[in-house]
Amino acid sequence: MNDELRKRGSGYVRLRQICLVAPHLEPVISDIADIMGLSVCYRDGNVAKYGLENALLPVDTILLEVVAPTQPGTAAGRFLDKTGGRGGYMAIFCCDDPDQRGRHAREIGVRIANVIDHAPYHGVQLHPRDCRAAFIEFNHTEGSDDVLGPYPPAGPDWQKSIAKDVTQALVGVEMQSPEPQGLAEHWGRIIGIPVSKSKTGEPELKLPNGSFQFVRGESEIMSGLTFRVADVAKVRDAAKARGCAVSGDSFDLGGVTFRLAA
């Protein structure tokens, strides 16, 4: 944890959700569900007012969301136009005090883009241009510090949709940048965790339930997700059968590379 947040007595922070964006929900949602053996737990009708539709699938206790624009002029649509459809949209963290983390972000030059207050849920979204690569959101649900506790964005019974026979966990997020060390340090300052090194020597941010690895690439994007699965070959074959571009133990879907690990 960095000094600024340590001084403020900051508590826990965990990866709660990854959000991808696609021009249309289908076939992306059906592909993810079929290939990865996951189930949709919720479709939030409230996002329609933002010109969006969405679906969420639990990967153990982390939620994987896909959003798609339903009308012109949405933030998600602008993101697609800017990136050409490559790159994840949001990294969402649960914590004890989103407002404190929002204040800290402002102090280091990262603007707050949106505050969502739907009791018992409270979220602070940071400006993607200042975050670089993707949106960052911090949120907290009152009375729900348990990883299997209530989480309103995923619906009332999201836990019942957890399926672990094919995909067991989302264990890593890959971030790409021409300056991976600089992006890692920037995200580390925002989130409040120190930069370490991965087994392969890349800058890494370690959370209690996953890690962010930063690799060199032409543009700053969330480029990949790593999943622990029961049978790599079986999932890889399922991706091929759905028409995904497969390379080794990875395939492209929803604007990012899905990497498979045993």
Regions found by a protein language model. Give the residues of each.
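Short beta->alpha connector loops
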Residues: 47, 97, 117-119, 231
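An N-terminus-focused feature that recognizes amino-terminal "leader" regions
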Residues: 2-74
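Vicinal oxygen chelate
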Residues: 2-8, 14-23, 55-60, 65, 77-172, ...
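Surface-exposed interaction/gating patches
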Residues: 14-15, 19-25, 156-199, 210
